[in-house]
Swiss-Prot record:
InterPro entries: Ribosomal_bL32 (IPR002677), Ribosomal_bL32_bact (IPR044957), Ribosomal_zn-bd (IPR011332). The keyword Ribonucleoprotein applies. Residues 1-20 are annotated as: Disordered. One of its GO terms (cellular component) is large ribosomal subunit. PANTHER family: 50S RIBOSOMAL PROTEIN L32, LARGE RIBOSOMAL SUBUNIT PROTEIN BL32. Belongs to the bacterial ribosomal protein bL32 family. Residues 1-16 have a biased composition (Basic residues). NCBIfam families: rpmF_bact. This is Large ribosomal subunit protein bL32. Signal peptide: none annotated. GO terms for biological process: translation.
Length: 59
């Protein structure tokens, strides 16, 4: 059976786990309707992007 030759140091263990944390998603308010949207993305509520309507959203 395979067994580690040396104990993994806390530093190595921490470096390995450094990518496991959850990242906080970034949101910003849509200037047109005020709903939260992802940056550099179309607003799902009103269909606006960069000050103009890209997709017409049926109400």
């Amino acid at each position: 059976m395979a067994v580690p030759k040396r104990k993994t140091s806390p530093s190595k263990r921490g470096m390995r786990r450094s990518h496991d944390s959850l990242k906080v998603e970034a949101f910003q308010e849509c200037p047109n309707c005020g709903e939260l949207k992802r940056p550099h993305n179309l607003c799902n509520a009103c269909g606006h992007y960069n000050g103009r309507e890209v997709v017409s959203v049926g109400a």
